[in-house]
């Protein structure tokens, strides 16, 4: 789990109220507050419990398959003709993405708290699959809320969840995407507080979720840091990751925040362009507000109503962002940029053909930014990118767009 920060660190948040500057906090229904406080207390005990850490590490090694490899993308580097490009291969984890890191940690907490039922929300389906997987592993029933639009575009993951024994509940409200699924999951939680643990998949939601998810995902950056020192004898010049709610990104960013020589870039879903509403670039084009229990940057209209947003990638299709990212953006430690659907699609194809790796559409956004930046950097410079998920789930979406369907 995450290493303790130094004084005057970018890594010391959140405060006792769960705030990162003006962001974060706990904005929940009165009925949920006792549960949130119980979770906070249990988390405080667990993270200082050697037995909890040992079990987490054991499952990480033998069930998830950690450490994930650090891979030098030799052909991509040669093709772009600039900085050396390394991938942190989170898509090689059990279930095919970074999501399992957090799910294993949280299911251990749920067991400690005596909960007998798991609920989760999912967009791309990767968190749903990871939640259903750990629920099966620990013998707990699992209900996954998923927007009806996402159920349609992520059919392979829906089937996986059902095979794993989870009940998948399509949500037709709104645009039927991740925001709507999260709303339904919160409604379920309010009515089943005694038995149910809500396994949130991203670094958002009410405190302690953003901190907890970050700490479970920080294994990505901790490993990558060590692996980079072994491979190159130094840290990278640039770290890049895709940002939806922001869990894979904060996982790789956080261990590097206090390393001043490392530039950090988060890549948002620019969708069809920032001039309309067909994007999910909360930091680039949003404004502060409250959603799903925390204050952060949101896509909202003048009346504070949440916009639906759009991305080719179901996992980035969220009109908000984790509060720690909002804070890192405002203090200028991390730069956040948008990438359009067509750029991500092109990057998806480039990686597939040059390296024989089919990436998910989420990290394809990060890759598109790497493809832009690498040629402008020196050959002695190094880029580290989080390859957060594999693209099996996206092949039908991509095939349809490229006219390569059956």
From Swiss-Prot:
Class in the EC hierarchy, top level: lyase
UniProt KW tRNA processing keyword: no
Keywords associated with the record: Amino-acid biosynthesis, Aromatic amino acid biosynthesis, Lyase, Pyridoxal phosphate, Tryptophan biosynthesis
InterPro entries, A to Z: Trp_synth_b_CS (IPR006653), Trp_synth_beta (IPR006654), Trp_synth_beta/beta-like (IPR023026), TrpB-like_PALP (IPR001926), TrpB-like_PALP_sf (IPR036052)
Physiological role: The beta subunit is responsible for the synthesis of L-tryptophan from indole and L-serine.
Gene: trpB
Family according to the record: Belongs to the TrpB family.
Naturally occurring in which organism (per UniProt): Sinorhizobium medicae (strain WSM419)
Cofactor(s) needed by this chain: pyridoxal 5'-phosphate
Pathway the protein takes part in: Amino-acid biosynthesis; L-tryptophan biosynthesis; L-tryptophan from chorismate: step 5/5
HAMAP family found in the cross-reference section: Trp_synth_beta
SUPFAM superfamilies the UniProt entry points to: Tryptophan synthase beta subunit-like PLP-dependent enzymes
Single GO MF annotation: tryptophan synthase activity
Catalytic activity: (1S,2R)-1-C-(indol-3-yl)glycerol 3-phosphate + L-serine = D-glyceraldehyde 3-phosphate + L-tryptophan + H2O
Protein name (database record): Tryptophan synthase beta chain
Domain of life where this protein originates: Bacteria
Enzyme Commission number(s) of this protein: 4.2.1.20
N6-(pyridoxal phosphate)lysine PTM sites in chain numbering: 99
Record note on quaternary structure: Tetramer of two alpha and two beta chains.
Any one annotated GO CC term: cytoplasm
Keyword Amino-acid biosynthesis: yes
